[in-house]
């Protein structure tokens, strides 16, 4: 090796060593200062979340975790649901946000789980399989992507839509965010690792995000209506019956109007939940049970459940 290359290599090693030492010094200072590590997107669920090029974040298959005071388990599809059976039963696919997933209730307390028990108690001989494909934080845009790429592949007989609250939250346009994440997925994975393991990086990222928070709604009311219409149209093309859920506490104003307009235009039933809530958004355990009963009543009224 020539003296020139030895000199360059020495300079490179010196630069790397100096940078590493500087980073370690900053990290030590952050630890002494008591700065916390970054928290996962959903607290207590760090080991069960993974990046997704389709949906940004999703739950890992076969994972046991805890979220909002309640334990959960995922099946081989990463859903909070029993394993999907191929036994000829009629499948009811419930897609939505945390109100579908079952926020703050045990595994058997979500409305899809309660609906399954109510259907199992019937004696007409028809077998039904309710699949809980809800995910906390998801918007109607996530629902459309999921239905198109995965949901319809499950061959549901009935589809239940439950979106709206997360669409209305202000954190920037979700379609733009997902497009950027797809382009930069390796960078996002490194970002996640550093956020969860470096106090200095977590501190810098928090302040950076706060300074550039996007005030736009994740999905505006017009596109919310378009997403609903696209999901219903996709389902109908496959011969799937569709209904929608409305949570009156979170779907007043333009989002509720968009849902009502699409429901009228495409003639789909809407079940409105007005029962007790755990917080501003989510039903209580008793509320999920009442919602499941309302859904079953409407399914019977439509003639979709015999």
Residue ranges with predicted function:
Residues 13-29:
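Hydrophobic membrane-insertion alpha-helices, especially the h-region
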Residues 126-144, 149:
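A conserved hydrophobic secondary-structure block that centers on an alpha-helix together
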Residues 91-95, 131, 159-161:
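Conserved beta-strand elements of the Class I
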Residues 33-118, 122-123:
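Membrane/wall-proximal cationic-aromatic binding patches
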């Amino acid at each position: 090796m020539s003296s020139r290359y030895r000199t360059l290599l020495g300079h490179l090693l010196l630069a790397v060593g100096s940078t590493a030492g500087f980073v370690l010094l900053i990290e030590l200072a952050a630890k002494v200062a008591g700065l916390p590590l970054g928290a996962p997107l959903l607290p207590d669920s760090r080991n069960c979340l993974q990046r997704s090029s389709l949906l940004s974040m999703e739950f890992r298959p076969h994972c046991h975790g805890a979220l909002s005071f309640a334990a959960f388990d995922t099946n081989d599809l990463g859903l909070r649901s029993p394993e999907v059976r191929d036994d000829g039963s009629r499948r009811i696919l419930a897609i939505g946000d945390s109100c579908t997933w079952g926020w703050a209730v045990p595994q058997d307390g979500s409305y899809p789980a309660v609906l399954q028990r109510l259907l199992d108690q019937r004696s007409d001989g028809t077998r039904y399989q309710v699949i809980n494909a809800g995910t906390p934080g998801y918007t109607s845009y996530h629902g459309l992507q999921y239905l198109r790429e995965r949901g319809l592949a499950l061959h549901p007989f009935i589809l239940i839509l439950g979106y709206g609250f997360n669409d209305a939250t202000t954190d920037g346009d979700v379609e733009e965010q997902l497009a950027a994440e797809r382009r930069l997925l390796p960078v996002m994975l490194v970002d996640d690792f550093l956020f969860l393991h470096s106090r200095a990086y977590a501190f810098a990222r928090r302040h950076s995000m706060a300074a550039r928070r996007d005030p736009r709604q994740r999905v505006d009311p017009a596109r919310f209506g378009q997403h609903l219409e696209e999901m219903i149209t996709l389902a109908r093309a496959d011969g799937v019956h569709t209904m929608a859920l409305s949570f009156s506490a979170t779907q007043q104003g333009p989002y509720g109007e968009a849902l009502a307009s699409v429901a009228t235009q495409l003639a789909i039933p809407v079940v409105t939940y007005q029962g007790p809530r755990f917080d501003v958004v989510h039903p209580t355990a008793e509320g999920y049970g009442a919602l499941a009963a309302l859904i079953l009543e409407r399914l019977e009224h439509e003639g979709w459940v015999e």
